[in-house]
Amino acid sequence: MGQVHLHNRSFNKATSAGFLIALGIVYGDIGTSPLYAMQAIVRGQGGLANLSESFILGAVSLVIWTLTLITTVKYVLIALKADNHHEGGIFSLFTLVRRMRKWLIVPAMIGGATLLADGALTPAVTVTSAIEGLRGVTHVYSNQTTVMVTTLIILAFLFLIQRFGASLVGRLFGPIMFIWFGFLGVSGLINSFLDLSILKAINPYYAIHLLFSPENKAGFFILGSIFLVTTGAEALYSDLGHVGRGNIYVSWPFVKICIILSYCGQGAWLLAHRGEHIEKLNPFFAVLPDNMVIYVVILSTLAAIIASQALISGSFTLVSEAIRLKLLPLFKIYYPGQTLGQLYIPAVNFALWVTTSFFVLYFKTSEHMEAAYSLAITITMLMTTTLLTYFLIQKGTPKIAIAFISIGLFCIEGSFFAASLVQFINGAYIVVLIALAIIFVMFIWNKSHKIVMKYIKSLNINEYKNQLNALRHDESYDLYQTNVVYLTSKMDHEWIDRSILYSILDKRPKRAECYWFVNVKVTDEPYTSEYKVDMMDTDFIVRVNLYLGFRMRQEVPRYLRTIVTDLMESGRLPRQHQHYSITPGRKVGDFRFVVVEEKLMNARQMPGFERFVLQTKAQIKRITASPIRWFGLQFSEVTVETVPLVLSDVRNLEIHERLEQVDETEAPATN
């Protein structure tokens, strides 16, 4: 859920309001894991009848220390310090370290893709797990179809309201999650009194012992189920900019205590009832009195919806960052909220809705979804650790500390990844295939941009200033527009895309009073909004470099209005008097934006792989948004022109005139 990014003085500060906001945004995923994590652990052992005291203590101990080592140590104590001007997440981390090694784009792409794929499964498993609590309400629950239909209706409603923004209901998220965590803590504490020996689980001995114990039927692979307790840790880092480091530091101890108490309460209940035969057991709901189940189902459903909303909003943010980093194609982006960061991407919303609904229909139960859940997020965490290692190197952290942290995290997360591999055949392959598809698109888009930059030819604009000056005074040509603006992807000092000058001078001479060449540069800082102007020693050629952060909207006309006003007030740009206008004394003329698109020709000199990449990109572009909407040009006068990408490879086809008389019957006539 988008929020206004925080200023320096408030980023490290904790407030009561910030505490509630953090509960509503950051902890939805990790806070709903008690709904299904212990259920997966019990099922992996073969059910309640097969549980021993040492197994239960070991399982709860693994839960406690997984939350401690992964969430607390890695994310809260280490990753939160790796902020990019107060923003977190894998792409923010990548922008901090991408200049250290070119290949670091690989873990960034893999981590981003698996995080997006995981975001499609999380709403399905959390909402389904909550609704399955109805199994304990006989007059409501009839069969699993009831759960599936209810889940699909809730998800449909959730995705349909995205276009209106989350701000209307977002203010309720914090108080609801406060009640949710309070319930987890209180109910867990009460149930812990069923068998206080559960407190032994704090000792890591029981966790280590269980991994090698013959009583553990799943063996090492139990870690695949254990990892479910910390799948939301990555979201904690991604939402850093939304709530601030101070609020996370204060709220996480409260959240962690409540979650651990919930697991301890479930563990104590299992100790008190071990040896019993209960089918389709979910300890989370089993610990409740019958008359409370329906109310807890409602509360857990609200918590699941909030967790899903946070992941959906996070997916929008992740995609928008990938677009600005040239890792994904352009998609239509809307900003339904009034605060910076609230955005809505219809294509992503629809894809998530379809994929999430498919997961509900395909897996049917939360038990089956859990089997596919954790593999993708373990990959994301490994990629984050890779980037985090280079961040520590960049910051000058002592080598021994880097080695200790990195090797430790790689060993722990590598173990979870290896244990989760067994889930591949149980459904995780679907999530992996989705992630691979996203990685493929990212690779094509990023690689194609590099190829295009290689083939685009540049010309020195100084050599054409006289022609442009002559053209603007040549009244034999109609005035094309007072101001003609070209958006260029490549502009280096006085060098400019050949295709742009080709459009102005060759394709159809475009007479104008002023020629603008605008290049948008995405900065490593998230919220930069600056510009640099070069008049090229003229008053009719303006080169503009827009420096926009990777989380800023690239709405060129809005920025250009400010730049024009600044230039005229400083006397660098002549005033453009308008005789006809509804605005008295208007000093700025009309504008036309020209978007030049390079199209791939059948370039014989281009290697086959490069041709494949560009042809694939062309097919992908057919289903994505145009630059017109991306750059905010939909309400401006716009001309889209097409030029061949490889101008240097255009050759004249050889053909010779036949001198002898040709019989008219030799060739059919064409009309």
Swiss-Prot record:
Entry membrane topology: Multi-pass membrane protein
Task: Spell out the reaction equation it catalyses.
Answer: K(+)(in) + H(+)(in) = K(+)(out) + H(+)(out)
Q: Does the keyword Cell membrane apply?
A: yes
- What are the UniProt keywords, alphabetically? Cell membrane, Ion transport, Membrane, Potassium, Potassium transport, Symport, Transmembrane, Transmembrane helix, Transport
Please name the GO terms that the record assigns under molecular function. potassium ion transmembrane transporter activity; symporter activity
Positions of transmembrane segments = 18-38, 60-80, 103-123, 149-169, 173-193, 218-238, 252-272, 292-312, 343-363, 373-393, 402-422, 424-444
Q: Name one Pfam family in it.
A: K_trans_C
Q: What does this protein do?
A: Transport of potassium into the cell. Likely operates as a K(+):H(+) symporter.
UniProt protein name = Probable potassium transport system protein Kup 2
Organism whose genome encodes this protein: Lactococcus lactis subsp. cremoris (strain MG1363)
Name of the encoding gene: kup2
